[in-house]
UniProtKB/Swiss-Prot annotation:
Name this polypeptide is given: Serine carboxypeptidase-like 21
Glycan attachment residues as annotated in the record: N37, N69, N198, N248, N402, N460
Gene it is expressed from: SCPL21
Any one GO molecular-function label of the UniProt entry: serine-type carboxypeptidase activity
Native source species: Arabidopsis thaliana (Mouse-ear cress)
Signal peptide (residue range): 1-23
Amino acid sequence: MGRLVEAIIASILLSLCFTITKSAPKSALITNLPGFNGTFPSKHYAGYVAIDKHRNKNLWYYFVESERNASVDPVVLWLNGGPGCSSMDGFVYEHGPFNFEPKKKNSHLLHLNPYSWSKVSNIIYLDSPVGVGFSYSNDNADYTTDDTKTASDTHTFLLEWFKMFPEFQSNPFFISGESYAGIYVPTLAAEVVKGHKNVTKPVINFKGYLVGNGVTDEVFDGNALVPFTHGMGLISDELYEETKLVCNGTYYTGGQSGVSKECAGKLKTVSDTVNLLNLYNILEPCYHGTSLSALDIEFLPKSLLTLGKTEKPMAVRKRMFGRAWPLGAVVRPGIVPSWSQLLAGFGVPCIDDTVATKWLNDPAVRKAVHAKEEKAIGNWELCSSNLEYRHDTGSMIEYHRNLTLSGFRALIFSGDHDMCVPYTGSEAWTKAMGYKVVDEWRPWMSNNQVAGFTQGYANNLTFLTIKGAGHTVPEYKPRESLDFYSRFLAGEKI
């Protein structure tokens, strides 16, 4: 009897594997990648999904099948932030199947990444919204967008994608992302849940989501920096106590009445003290100059918060994302690592995106990944200079509350050396949800070492820090990231 059962199971698995080979669109299969000399550890696909055929509005994706068991492993959507930054950032610099190394004599650019998230999951890297990366529309009006439209368009993409890859419809599905994806992820999750209630087909087997160093709430995020700088030993006890006193412990007011002149002065002193540091990881050197910090928002003119609709967003190349801003503000995409950059347009410091930019603009690479030619849609930028983006959804706290109370699992993780979206803000808002603590603050382990700290709450909410990591956690701590990612997807204790 046992052998009969084993034979039946083997037959089912073989059938599933055959289905994967048969069902996935052959035209999307990637057969080679310039810079890589070897055999892919799993199948890769890329191409466009039309989310509005009439307008020729298309989102581009890169899909990596799991290296373990694609037929049953979770499908995970990855979204980088910005707003307006390509998710190929995650592919190239964080947790993709390859490590990109500067080309040396007689060597190749791409090498297999032992800590790729495709070791344990199928993963979709999506360029969203339209106008980002290789995604495009024939109607330039589509490059003016907002949180609500982005969530709706990405949900449409998912429905169409699962029709193209029907063999994955029964797999557990998770949404993940970092930085401004702290907005993208919960708003998209809410759309997916709404689709469930409306019995939208195909039904997406949504189980939960992960957010790394994510923008969440204007006030919580805005108040996070001063405690972070003090806790990290970046400002003196005296300056911290003086700032705390004159600001009454509140360093950002959400654009209501502002702060006092005395408070603004102390905040500027804090800003001046830390502004030579790498915003995205205070342990790392800063390569491209410096930037003022987020604290400057309190004493800069509010009139600088918006761009006029006729003003083209700045064509600057940058890598990171980050801080929330007042509801309704029109944003220069990709320029949100600090309020001062948002308002004054300084560009993003300390970051080098040369490898991704050169590789993805190589005509042979674009052809290999089924992306439009440069003459058709322009050059690939890590963060788009084509968008006008409006933040229109406000705080994400109620989104998280609704999702977790509905039974969906949530992991909020933070690199503890990120000064862009400090862990202090994420720790504060997860605690403010008011859920019962079911797993008290403790270290979590990776490779027999303390990798960070975690606290678990009722209703499937977990907060996690990663020791020594910056804004883009898997970039700095790849082994540890694969560990917590694997455990979360499997429903195991981290």
